[in-house]
């Protein structure tokens, strides 16, 4: 909602500037577009609980968003003070009562030193209310000026965040941070990074259709990526004033849960869009995020990729295929266990699917398969497919 402009991170339009500890939001008029309200967050919690999703990420919960971007201010956020319409205790209690957790969000506005000053208090607050993961953000030019997102100062900063979070038993999903280089092997609480153009760029003109079949060969070689997939209503103009569109088909979005490896995955569309395409959403309900094995079945950089992954601690497999140009994927099920049968659900592009002309055309095929079977699957231009293979 915020990315396309139907909601805002900010609470009010009354403030041209914000001063930490001085600005009194209780005297401000709400703007009516603030996204992180008690009512809206509870709606998302209910949806997550109903569909087996573990956490709800809430952005724009804390004071300071009226003055966060473009001014290169050091002291905008303290990361502990919620807006008047966000009851942090009530919402966490409500989420826990539903078997769901809230995920914390710390947008730093690239004021790294300010974040470090407040980090202990911010993580203590998370421990107090039961948060176990934080999405950090570094939008805008780095403060102090003259530093860059990839500079030594910032690499040292990202490392301090990871290590401090680990002491608090907190997982980190860093956005706009430096490209990881395997550090998650040493610090496994780094469960995700953006560090490349993710789905949010689809609202700003879009990523080319080959983008998602290039990243597995480049960005993802250094560690997991939070690509924020799962957009079903790909024509943004159909539900907002944004004229951009997502450069994949609906099934192409499903494939990203396998192609874009991350032990932390987002379902980035609106609940009402998932309810509209509930049969396709079943794959997101089913797909795992942690794996015992991965096999790359076919791949060509910037052209196509097909990967199969075995869900951790189970005999279940999931397969995702993504393409730039239209093609027929050939999936050989040689990786399945001999002697077992699998309930196979194939989510594939429809015959007339195309990421620009007909992105929501899809079909779901159910069958029983075994080791050695071969599946031939249609992939549309900018499309893809997803398969669940559940051991019987």
Say what each PLM segment does.
Residues 1-98, 106, 384:
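Conserved structural scaffold segments of CAZyme catalytic domains across common CAZy folds
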Residues 21, 58-59, 103-107, 134-139, ...:
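Generic beta-strand/beta-sheet core signal
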Residues 48, 172, 259, 319:
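Conserved, mostly hydrophobic/aromatic
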Residues 59-245, 249:
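Aromatic- and carboxylate-enriched substrate-binding clefts and catalytic-loop regions
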Residues 251-298:
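Catalytic cores of secreted or luminal carbohydrate-active enzymes
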Residues 300-343, 385-386:
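Carbohydrate-binding surface patches
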Residues 346-372:
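Solvent-exposed beta-strand/loop surfaces of large extracellular or lumenal domains
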Residues 365-392:
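C-terminal beta-strand-rich structural cap/linker in extracellular carbohydrate-active enzymes
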